[in-house]
């Protein structure tokens, strides 16, 4: 039984169940969830003398660990950003104006001071919509708070909320224009960023308007199924991350149970290598954050459904790869299978290397011919799955964790590059 709790300021006070109820009812507004069940689950998980933030975190975990619906993600997201607002602006959420926020960060040397007129500051302040933070899912808040908003690298305390980050970037871009165009441009760019129509490069979030003055730097890396290629890829990820680059990686590796070393070893799959990429990228800090990597995987991969879920907060912690970004690749043949609601073949690159290579070619007929040959060859291990099931899994993760998509054939048809394109980068 919880009798006392510790507040944010360190003081102890009697536990007030009505406050827990208030948090749960507030987070559930217009969502229609069983907020009582969520609050009770949080209460059962915490002990006497816990912190109030522990209770909020327990409610978040009750949503994202045990449930995967959009409503639960929104419920948890509201609790998360509510906690951020409490830490930044106090119990009454005394949110500063855009000018007050900017001047505060400029005084600390976090951002470069911008020189708008008082009238412009008032107009800009009318643009920002803080309520949009309450409409973001938990997975979005976690990603933004870890990667994109400015923070004190020593204490970990955030300097800004998502909406303040969007307006900061918009103001910096607009400050380079003529006075008469500045406020209009702030509004246009803020709307694009805040409504998620435009996804800006990660370095922009971190550097725009700050003394760092860095610009995006992007690298793509191709890894094939050999020890030498793996070694070179891992070294490249480490070196590029140390130099501030965002990295797009395509790993064409064997799948679980594929033979290794003349059938003396069974392959363990891609997870360990993805985890190594993640660790090497995070080993080097870029303005307080780790390096950023986007893993590209395809519709042919036997692990496709598992890979799609590795970023999700509901995935077990020992498997979860929360700090990597993922992009799903497919071609016209896969789209046909989705449209026709037919089966789709999953096969390892070890058994069908030519098919995997043709996935990146614009010639649809060549791919289909090789696809049918591999499918008919009974000596090649494979499995058939409904194409719509694969796409459904990927699209669900796109909504929950901002997963991306690319079209392997189209990006090699509509291109000025002579070399085959295997991956891109979020920048």
Explain the meaning of each model-derived region.
Residues 1-427:
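Extended catalytic cores of very large enzyme megasubunits
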């Amino acid at each position: 039984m919880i009798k006392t709790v510790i507040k944010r300021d360190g003081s102890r006070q009697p536990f007030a169940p009505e406050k827990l109820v208030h948090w749960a009812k507030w987070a559930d507004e217009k969502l229609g969830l069983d907020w009582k069940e969520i609050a009770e689950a949080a209460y059962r998980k915490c002990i006497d003398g816990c912190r109030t933030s522990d209770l909020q975190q327990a409610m978040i975990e009750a949503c994202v660990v045990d449930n995967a619906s959009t409503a639960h993600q929104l419920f948890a997201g509201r609790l998360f950003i509510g906690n951020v607002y409490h830490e930044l602006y106090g119990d009454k959420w005394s949110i500063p104006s855009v000018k007050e926020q900017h001047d505060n960060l400029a005084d600390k040397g976090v951002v470069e001071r911008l020189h708008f007129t008082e009238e412009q500051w008032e107009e800009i302040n009318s643009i920002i919509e803080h309520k949009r933070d309450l409409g973001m899912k938990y997975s979005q808040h976690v990603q933004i708070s870890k990667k994109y908003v400015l923070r004190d690298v020593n204490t970990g305390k955030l300097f800004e909320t998502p909406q303040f980050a969007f307006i900061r970037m918009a103001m910096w871009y607009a400050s380079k224009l003529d006075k008469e165009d500045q406020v209009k441009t702030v509004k246009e760019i803020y709307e694009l960023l805040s409504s998620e129509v435009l996804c800006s490069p990660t370095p922009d979030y971190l550097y725009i308007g700050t003394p760092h003055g860095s610009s995006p730097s992007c690298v793509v890396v191709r890894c094939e199924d050999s020890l030498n290629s793996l070694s070179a890829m891992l070294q490249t990820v480490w070196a590029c991350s140390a130099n501030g680059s965002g990295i797009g990686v395509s790993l064409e590796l064997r799948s679980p149970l594929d033979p290794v070393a003349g059938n003396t070893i069974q392959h363990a799959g891609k997870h360990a290598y993805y985890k190594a990429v993640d660790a090497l990228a995070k080993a080097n800090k870029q303005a307080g954050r780790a390096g950023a990597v986007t893993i590209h995987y395809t519709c042919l991969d036997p692990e496709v459904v598992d890979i799609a879920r590795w970023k999700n907060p509901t995935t077990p912690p020992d498997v979860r790869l929360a700090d990597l970004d993922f992009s799903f690749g497919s071609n016209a043949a896969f789209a046909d299978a989705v449209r026709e609601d037919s089966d789709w073949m999953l096969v390892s690159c070890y058994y069908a290397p030519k098919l995997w290579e043709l996935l990146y070619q614009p010639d649809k007929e060549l791919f289909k011919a090789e696809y049918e040959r591999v499918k008919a060859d009974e000596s090649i291990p494979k499995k058939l799955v409904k194409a719509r099931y694969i796409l459904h899994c990927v699209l669900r993760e796109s909504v929950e964790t901002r997963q991306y998509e690319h079209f392997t054939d189209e990006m090699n048809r509509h291109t000025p590059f002579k070399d085959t394109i295997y991956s891109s980068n979020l920048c």
